[in-house]
Amino acid sequence: MKKLKLHGFNNLTKSLSFCIYDICYAKTAEERDGYIAYIDELYNANRLTEILSETCSIIGANILNIARQDYEPQGASVTILVSEEPMDPKLIDQTEHPGPLPETVVAHLDKSHICVHTYPESHPEGGLCTFRADIEVSTCGVISPLKALNYLIHQLESDIVTIDYRVRGFTRDVNGMKHFIDHEINSIQNFMSEDMKSLYDMVDVNVYQENIFHTKMLLKEFDLKHYMFHTKPEDLTETERQEITAALWKEMREIYYGRNMPAV
């Protein structure tokens, strides 16, 4: 897309929001309580603040204020207010390509608000536990929150991811013409690294004329030992392993498709 010469500030709002799910099987009530306590501590308010602060660096945001809270019995939330520094538009990369990975983050930039809320969950029957993190990165101006996508998904354990990106409002060029988007985008997937795309089955549902983009991701590889909490698959009977695998896959598909499915 050709560089736009704007009249005044870029008034477009770009919002990236996604849910990240981690699924686990805990055989006993004690194991379920243990998983909830483990995941709640792993993603406490302090750890989430570190992740979001690095996100600010990636998208180019100056932190104005941080509000964080751990909840009882579980869960946490962090909200960061951010602002944008004056930046030379020539230095802003608007091309459609993946953002940095955690180990390659060296950028410094800035913007609007970033927030995350966590929801650990379990049920006394069935042994299934889920952890959900809701994240929203919203910016105003030339910087795209999509640059933080790679980093955030790599930082959180992700069996299932649902992502929404939308551009709202308009900005004017020097001739007074309105522009409702200032960068090219065909798919959110174009902002993901190849190694990430190789790990997931993905589907897009996009409404191009409304500047709304949606991608769903489901982890391809399934290894039962990665889903067990304090129980080894080899300590179970073959029938138990098959039943647990079926229950986990059903849970993951229901979350991925957003509807309950009949038992097979």
Curated annotation (Swiss-Prot):
Catalytic reaction list: S-adenosyl-L-methionine + H(+) = S-adenosyl 3-(methylsulfanyl)propylamine + CO2
Molecular functions (GO terms): adenosylmethionine decarboxylase activity
Modified residues annotated as Pyruvic acid (Ser) in this record: S112
Site feature (Cleavage (non-hydrolytic)) residues: K111, S112
One GO CC term on file: cytosol
EC number: 4.1.1.50
Needed co-factor(s): pyruvate
InterPro entries: AdoMetDC_fam_prok, S-AdoMet_deCO2ase_bac, S-AdoMet_deCO2ase_core
The keyword Secreted is annotated on this UniProt entry: no
Cofactor note: Binds 1 pyruvoyl group covalently per subunit.
GO biological process, one term: spermidine biosynthetic process
Top-rank lineage group of the source organism: Bacteria
Post-translational modifications: Is synthesized initially as an inactive proenzyme. Formation of the active enzyme involves a self-maturation process in which the active site pyruvoyl group is generated from an internal serine residue via an autocatalytic post-translational modification. Two non-identical subunits are generated from the proenzyme in this reaction, and the pyruvate is formed at the N-terminus of the alpha chain, which is derived from the carboxyl end of the proenzyme.
Tagged with keyword Cell wall biogenesis/degradation: no
Top-level enzyme category: lyase
Sorted UniProt keywords: Autocatalytic cleavage, Decarboxylase, Lyase, Polyamine biosynthesis, Pyruvate, S-adenosyl-L-methionine, Schiff base, Spermidine biosynthesis, Zymogen
Subunit structure: Heterooctamer of four alpha and four beta chains arranged as a tetramer of alpha/beta heterodimers.
Function recorded in the entry: Catalyzes the decarboxylation of S-adenosylmethionine to S-adenosylmethioninamine (dcAdoMet), the propylamine donor required for the synthesis of the polyamines spermine and spermidine from the diamine putrescine.
Cross-referenced PANTHER family: S-ADENOSYLMETHIONINE DECARBOXYLASE PROENZYME (PTHR33866:SF1)
Protein's UniProt name: S-adenosylmethionine decarboxylase proenzyme
Organism phylogeny: Bacteria, Pseudomonadati, Pseudomonadota, Gammaproteobacteria, Enterobacterales
